[in-house]
A protein has these predicted regions:
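Residues lining hydrophobic/aromatic ligand-binding pockets adjacent to catalytic sites
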Residues: 1-167
């Protein structure tokens, strides 16, 4: 008989904005056995101060720190959903980096078209035992990013505690 896969005790989230690489890695290092789960559609970040967060550089830095990485594109918002959020940001007069919350239309669309169609149980089962998955995206504030929706679903459906790592 095969032992059942254990479920992580918690999930963490982290954005890229407002971190530098050293502080980002230090924050991850405070977690027990972190595994970065990149949920970005486009794994590049604009601005020279965030060059470290572009996919290949980030993967090299994580590997050097002994932190596993995986990209789960199916949890990323579609281009259409991202455009919907950008339009809401423009209408509210807020920039992407200063956004505090997600637009209700974006929320509904992300939940219906992405989150409800994704098997989070399968994601959890694919992770090694005793790890802390760390959902990675761009926004500094978790409430301004879809990663908080994923973390919330993991909490409500799988009993994981949620830790938001913020700069």
């Amino acid at each position: 008989m095969v032992a059942p896969q254990s479920v992580p005790a918690r999930v963490a989230t982290i954005g890229v904005h407002d971190w530098d690489l050293d502080c980002f890695l230090a924050a991850l290092g405070e977690l027990e056995h972190p595994v970065v789960v990149d949920v970005r559609q486009r794994r590049g970040v604009r601005g020279p101060q965030y060059a470290w967060a572009n996919s290949q550089r980030l993967q090299r830095a994580l590997a050097a720190a002994g932190i596993p990485y995986r990209h789960v594109r199916n949890l990323a918002p579609t281009t259409e959903l991202r455009q919907l959020q950008y339009a809401a940001d423009d209408a509210a007069g807020v920039g992407k980096r200063s956004r505090q919350t997600l637009d209700p239309g974006y929320l509904a669309g992300y939940i219906e078209h992405i989150l409800d169609r994704f098997d989070l149980s399968e994601l959890l089962a694919s992770l090694p035992d005793d790890v802390t998955p760390v959902l990675l995206c761009v926004e500094a504030q978790p409430g301004a990013c879809h990663r908080s929706l994923i973390a919330g679903r993991l909490a409500s459906e799988h009993g994981l505690d949620v830790v938001h790592l913020c700069p």
